[in-house]
């Protein structure tokens, strides 16, 4: 049985015109896993996420997790018709990081009423929505950030999250049936001394099979012959 990838949003840290930020939906056999949940994603999900079984967050930059906040308000004021809360898988220490925000806003209950909270461990596999996931640490401006290898039905899907060029990224993509990889930069020298993103050439150099570039600014041309993600795009893996 195939796995379907739907690009809900794919903008970089500044939104492309009319586009949501990072959110990628994997579905198979009535199971649904959302990778990242940036601004604009919730409103573009079918049923505003009512069928999403689990969410996994690569890192805590706003363009990858910002719509967790409206998801909480939606659940509080217009709760979807569902039997149980979706699982939310966070990087190590993530539960407390969210709790700090909730206390600051004066709503310490917001996350527990919205999600079943979990933290994943680097390099250790965990299961979410029936998918087997391995979180692999990648370099991103010195913060804690991860890419994911996702397995189901004999297929392996790799997602870079946000990453600089690194051997860890190559290992993440090795042997994958499909690699969704960010390509934010026009060239590597446009990044800072402490790297955090990839150019298209750097993204392609890490690939080991079929690839889809994402997190790509609208201002940059797509490399000739290389597919680039757009909102609403559907890929069968």
Regions found by a protein language model. Give the residues of each.
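Cap/insert and terminal regions of metallo-dependent hydrolase folds
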Residues: 164-237
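Active-site-proximal loop/helix segment associated with metal-binding centers of metalloenzymes
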Residues: 14-19, 112, 119-188
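General small-molecule cofactor/ligand-binding pocket signal
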Residues: 6, 89, 116-121, 134-136, ...
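Active-site neighborhood of divalent metal-dependent phosphoester bond hydrolases
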Residues: 81-86, 94-117
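A short helix->loop->beta-strand "cap" motif at the edges of active sites that frequently abuts
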Residues: 31, 82-86, 207-211
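Active-site neighborhood of phospho(di)ester-bond hydrolases with catalytic His/Asp-centered motifs
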Residues: 34-38, 53-63, 91, 157-161, ...
